[in-house]
Curated annotation (Swiss-Prot):
This is Succinate-semialdehyde dehydrogenase. InterPro entries: Ald_DH/histidinol_DH, Ald_DH_C, Ald_DH_CS_GLU, Ald_DH_N, Aldehyde_DH_dom, Aldehyde_DH_Superfamily. Keywords: NAD, NADP, Oxidoreductase, Plasmid. The active site is at residues 219, 253. PANTHER family: SUCCINATE-SEMIALDEHYDE DEHYDROGENASE, MITOCHONDRIAL (PTHR43353:SF5). The gene is sad.
Amino acid sequence: MLATLASATSEDAVAALEAACAAQTSWARTAPRVRAEILRRAFDLVTARSEDFALLMTLEMGKPLAEARGEVAYGAEFLRWFSEETVRDYGRYLTTPEGKNKILVQHKPVGPCLLITPWNFPLAMATRKVAPAVAAGCTMVLKPAKLTPLTSQLFAQTMMEAGLPAGVLNVVSSSSASGISGPLLKDSRLRKVSFTGSTPVGKRLMSDASRHVLRTSMELGGNAPFVVFEDADLDKAVEGAMAAKMRNMGEACTAANRFLVQESVAQEFTRKFAAAMGALSTGRGTDPASQVGPLINNGARDDIHALVTAAVDAGAVAVTGGAPVDGPGYFYQPTVLADVPNNAAILGQEIFGPVAPVTTFTTEQDAIKLANASEYGLAAYLYSRDFNRLLRVAEQIEFGMVGFNAGIISNAAAPFGGVKQSGLGREGGSEGIAEYTTTQYIGIADPYEN
């Protein structure tokens, strides 16, 4: 046991919202430069405490320390990025086409927000939501996942030390997610909900948010295709596949989930990919030699093994791995499956683990059809030496983010988000702050006639 926390009640959630509402007016009027400086100090503090955050995340959810350190750097970057974006949230002033009246457009904070974060990236998902909300002038209630509440507590403490006023960020940790979101979504004072998690839960939150027509940002499930064309550099494709599949042990919504490889190079790619996967070391996240940590719980391990077993029963071949690791802990062998039938269940849902199913295609149009054969549309990865082909395919596949010869594409400066059932809205980039503002238009009579 790492620690014990009080489980927040519905009353605690409402009290947190009341604190956010009380702070909203003064926070919205705080100068953008002041908000920017708070975010920049928070970046410096999180970076200085990198080892503390990394160890805490490893202890909470098992990821290797190297992965955790990478998350700290990635998560901190949202604080720095939005510290710089805070003063660039421009409106505009223009003359009407008729030339008489004037148009003034300004951006205002949307108001108190509910931010719900997942367990797989407990720091980065918090900073990716909190930073733009702070930049826009919004107050917040942050609900971290019940499996990883400690990281958010440390982050909130760090934000306070950076100078964030009381009431702007209110963390409510609870074993009952609905006990927090339920009463808040019924309260008309809440003006936005931002959620990262599963599509079914996101749909329920959107339904509840419709009661008061709340602004919503939904970063939901993914089923990313990793497409390798016959003209790709296979060594670089394998390197990218390892990054896209094994970041965070595969417990990421952007993780490559379906490896679509052109028939003429499928055997060579699969052989090299399996060799790289099989060479990974599995162990406790605190062991410096570990490259793959445990899954989040026993249920996750059992679900993954059921998908692998069903695929093998349907004709797939486990080239490497294919079973839980013997001994204590929720470990699963890094696995590559070849000859996976296109109708296999493992190709149709998020795996959220270290398993890579490989299937083949014949033509470019076949690859596009297979890539789009999913209700999800978050991330996709394309490997080819032909840039025109990459552009053609990217324009025809239904995904919010596409990597060209790159296995990791997330960046604070880029708009993160998907289409179809992968969600609504964008986090990061210049688009990120817009998710927390509302647009007000002011019509001004002709100043030369008044």
